[in-house]
A protein has these predicted regions:
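Intrinsically disordered, low-complexity terminal regulatory regions
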Residues: 1-75, 154, 158-169
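A short acidic/glycine-rich loop-to-helix N-cap element
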Residues: 141-148
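Sensory-domain boundary capping and coupling elements
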Residues: 124-138
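Regulatory sensory and allosteric helical modules in signal-transduction proteins
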Residues: 60-113
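A short, aliphatic-rich beta-strand micro-motif
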Residues: 117-125
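A short acidic/small-residue loop/turn micro-motif
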Residues: 74, 138-139
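Short hydrophobic/aromatic beta-strand element in the GNAT-like acyltransferase core
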Residues: 54, 120, 133
């Protein structure tokens, strides 16, 4: 089995993110439904990057619980408390979690045994309310770079601003 293609350099990654963000912006222009937005973002990201093997959102449904939202890939964990796993850590701390090797992360929850690396970015409103976390898993060890993290954080900020008034949790 061949490994998924990982863009070789920072410029290629940044360009790919810029292109997908342009598509996402066009698709979400005027959109007010948070669930539809999450589904669209997950789909666009997942089909743009070959090294993304699970791409989706866990919605913040209370002050201490995430529930799986729209995603692409195999099944996800259904519920994740804030005190468990990489997604829980991102929700709890409101900070991006960058995990080059999930085998080295003591708190990693193995929703899929094939996952080797992960990045999780909180999606918060400008006033700090957590809407969701964006979770990206790869079956490739050390698949993500600082460029991935920075670009996903930019996307999360934009989503948090656009959907700050959503009633859907």
């Amino acid at each position: 089995m061949t490994q998924p293609a990982v863009p070789p350099d920072t410029y290629a990654r940044a360009t790919a993110y810029t292109d997908v963000f342009d598509r996402i912006d066009a698709l979400l222009e005027g959109e007010t439904d948070w669930i539809a937005a999450m589904a669209t973002v997950a789909c666009e990201l997942h089909h743009t990057f070959d090294y993304y093997d699970w791409t989706g959102f866990y919605r913040a449904v209370s002050d201490d619980l995430l529930v799986v939202g729209p995603y692409q890939g195999s099944h996800g964990c259904l519920r994740i408390p804030f005190d468990r796993g990489v997604c829980g850590a991102a929700a709890r701390t409101r900070e991006t979690q960058f995990v080059p090797d999930v085998e080295e992360a003591a708190d990693h929850i193995a929703c899929s045994s094939s996952t080797r690396s992960e990045v999780v970015v909180p999606v918060t409103t400008p006033d700090g309310q957590l809407l969701a976390v964006l979770d990206i898993d790869s079956d490739t060890l050390d698949a993500f770079t600082e460029t991935d993290t920075q670009m996903l954080e930019q996307l999360a900020t934009r989503l948090g601003e656009q959907f700050a008034s959503t009633e859907q949790r």
